[in-house]
Amino acid sequence: MPYIPHTPDDVRAMLDAIGADSIEDLFDEIPSHLKAAGKLDALPEGLSEMDVTRLMSDRAAQDAGAVSFIGAGAYQHHVPAAVWEIATRGEFYTAYTPYQAEASQGTLQVIYEFQTLMTRLTGMDVSNASVYDGASGLAEAVLMSLRANRKSKSRKVLVPTAVNPRYTSATQAIVENQDVALERVGFDAASGQTPLDALKPYEGEDYAALVISQPNFFGSLEEVDALTDWAHANKMLVIGVVNPTSLALLTPPGEWGADGADIVVGEGQPLGVPLSSGGPYFGFMCCKQKHVRQMPGRIIGRTVDMEGKQGFTLTLQAREQHIRRSKATSNICTNQGLAMTAATIYTSLLGPDGLGNVAAHCHANTQALADKLTAIDGVERAFTAPTFHEVVLTLPKPADQVLAALAEKDVLGGVSLAGDYDMNNAILVNATEVHSEQDLQLFEQALKEVLA
């Protein structure tokens, strides 16, 4: 049955009201050669719900099963069943911060708890209610740094090439029409880190901020203390891009160097959000208290009403688009509420010890995988720097060729670095707590056969 509720008389009345002769007139700006003539005959006839279910089940059964060692910004973690059982309850199941928000005290408290968790995890003073994802979060941080750094009049930001290329390209797309320049800083070919030597040409120059990724795209751990102190000595703010899982083991960005990072962003997907064809994910964003009025996104505050009862409210709303219009800190006027709720539940269920165990298993499995693979002739670690849960390996054959052969053996063996870094024989591999010893052995055996 059709699901269009308008009768021919309804359609005629609406067309008369807007002065159009036909529905086709509404689309006259589309060139005729781009319009489909007549019906779309290739479309099959409609099916019943039962038949659609059967059809989609049959198609899903055709999917090939494979063990994945792909990371590069989106990571496979175990998500306890309780996380989404709670997150999808009717009380929580919403996509974003509700309008008339103070009427939804439960939702606001969840966001407030999320903000508290993120500040504790990052060691920062303030968190917002989340942004769209980690990549756009970096763009927001870059724009925020221009407003927040009162010691600089620059519209330029230093971005190491070891930052996730997807983050950099997304940031470039967002800021390039706002008169912002991203100056690229190279990495050390031996360590895979951003060395202080690479920053020497920028000493004394006017830049708004330096971006530091920890770990960086190669999985290498940066010398964050030295980089942070260098940036501050040169009157730049520090934007930290971090993996939240790693913060259970690594020094939080709020404690980098003598004064800590100024702004921190990252992808929240590892905190209880399953992999799903690129989303929906969520980004987190934290900063020092003194920069809070330059932070984009919604912020939930806790207060007390006239009767002395605790209450939660949207605070500092004058920063936001619905009030400041074009002068707002960002055009983000909502948040990724559902994914953020799942992350709050996930982090609360695991607690500090549980999150630490996840991080420790990720690190241990990655080191074990690297040891197994580098025992194969011709396979070596590309860099000397310590890593968290990703590592770059060089191969005796082209990476794309090897990865294609591994896929035929039901092993998704990582990400080729040939396109982004012109490292034709290098792959970025990842292991997390979900990978068993059997999975690691499967990868090892498959790679041996491919390279034989």
From Swiss-Prot:
Keywords, in A-Z order: Oxidoreductase
Which GO BP terms apply? glycine decarboxylation via glycine cleavage system; nucleoside metabolic process
Family listed: Belongs to the GcvP family. N-terminal subunit subfamily.
- For the protein in the UniProt heading, the enzyme class is oxidoreductase
The record's section on CDD domains has: GDC-P
What Gene Ontology molecular-function terms does this entry list? glycine dehydrogenase (decarboxylating) activity
Query: From what superkingdom does this record's organism come?
Result: Bacteria
Native species: Alcanivorax borkumensis (strain ATCC 700651 / DSM 11573 / NCIMB 13689 / SK2)
Q: Which reaction does it catalyse?
A: N(6)-[(R)-lipoyl]-L-lysyl-[glycine-cleavage complex H protein] + glycine + H(+) = N(6)-[(R)-S(8)-aminomethyldihydrolipoyl]-L-lysyl-[glycine-cleavage complex H protein] + CO2
InterPro entries given in the database record: GcvPA (IPR023010), GDC-P_N (IPR049315), GDC_P (IPR020581), PyrdxlP-dep_Trfase (IPR015424), PyrdxlP-dep_Trfase_major (IPR015421), PyrdxlP-dep_Trfase_small (IPR015422)
Give the protein's function: The glycine cleavage system catalyzes the degradation of glycine. The P protein binds the alpha-amino group of glycine through its pyridoxal phosphate cofactor; CO(2) is released and the remaining methylamine moiety is then transferred to the lipoamide cofactor of the H protein.
Catalytic activity, EC: 1.4.4.2
> What is the protein's name according to its record?
Probable glycine dehydrogenase (decarboxylating) subunit 1
Q: Record keywords: Oxidoreductase included?
A: yes
Q: Which NCBIfam families match?
A: PRK00451.1
